[in-house]
């Protein structure tokens, strides 16, 4: 299935929502430290309800530790950013792809973003003049589009 990577998430309910999303879609969740909250944060657990036990979640101390542990295919990694030039719906996603998202207030760190070629820096369309969409909403849009492209494989 797909892989969701949150780099330094800051807001517990957003991460809780993403945990619930991953549990319901079969996506794997990777959290890259530092996290803006402890993993047992009540707000995160409340947002994720009882889905934590159904989600496959891994925590990595930093970007390099994540890459070393998971060995993702660089050609199948996509950085979602308001500074992206590509439109996400122009990509053909396949199971196993890696979707990378930055923190709610800062987005992806420059040292992570610069590792992605321009064609893999993608954005969701939105109205001009707006800063960004909510992190968990963005993740949901991306995961469901990718899953749709895969024919909702494994879904009921």
Curated annotation (Swiss-Prot):
One of its GO terms (biological process) is wobble position uridine ribose methylation. Homodimer. Belongs to the class IV-like SAM-binding methyltransferase superfamily. RNA methyltransferase TrmH family. TrmL subfamily. It is found in: Cytoplasm. It is an enzyme of class 2 (transferase). GO terms for molecular function: RNA binding; tRNA (5-carboxymethylaminomethyluridine(34)-2'-O)-methyltransferase activity; tRNA (cytidine(34)-2'-O)-methyltransferase activity. S-adenosyl-L-methionine binds at residues 102, 124, 132. It catalyses: cytidine(34) in tRNA + S-adenosyl-L-methionine = 2'-O-methylcytidine(34) in tRNA + S-adenosyl-L-homocysteine + H(+); 5-carboxymethylaminomethyluridine(34) in tRNA(Leu) + S-adenosyl-L-methionine = 5-carboxymethylaminomethyl-2'-O-methyluridine(34) in tRNA(Leu) + S-adenosyl-L-homocysteine + H(+). Methylates the ribose at the nucleotide 34 wobble position in the two leucyl isoacceptors tRNA(Leu)(CmAA) and tRNA(Leu)(cmnm5UmAA). Catalyzes the methyl transfer from S-adenosyl-L-methionine to the 2'-OH of the wobble nucleotide. Transmembrane segments: none annotated. It comes from the Bacteria. This is tRNA (cytidine(34)-2'-O)-methyltransferase. It comes from Burkholderia ambifaria (strain ATCC BAA-244 / DSM 16087 / CCUG 44356 / LMG 19182 / AMMD). Its main location: cytoplasm. Keywords: Cytoplasm, Methyltransferase, S-adenosyl-L-methionine, Transferase, tRNA processing. One of its GO terms (cellular component) is cytoplasm. Its EC number is 2.1.1.207.
């Amino acid at each position: 299935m797909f892989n969701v990577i949150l780099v330094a998430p800051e807001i517990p309910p957003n991460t809780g929502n993403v945990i619930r999303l991953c549990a319901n879609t079969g996506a794997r969740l990777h959290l890259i430290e530092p996290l803006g909250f402890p993993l047992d944060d009540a707000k995160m657990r409340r947002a994720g309800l009882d889905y934590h036990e159904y989600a496959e979640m891994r925590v990595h101390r930093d970007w390099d530790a994540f890459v070393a542990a998971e060995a993702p295919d660089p050609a199948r990694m996509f950085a979602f950013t308001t500074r992206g030039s590509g439109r996400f719906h122009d990509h053909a996603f396949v199971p196993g792809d890696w979707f990378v998202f930055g923190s709610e207030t800062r987005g992806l760190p420059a040292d992570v973003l610069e590792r992605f070629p321009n064609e893999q820096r993608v954005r969701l369309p939105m109205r001009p003049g707006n800063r960004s969409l909510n992190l968990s909403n963005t993740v949901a849009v991306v995961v469901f589009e990718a899953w749709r492209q895969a024919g909702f494989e494994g879904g009921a």
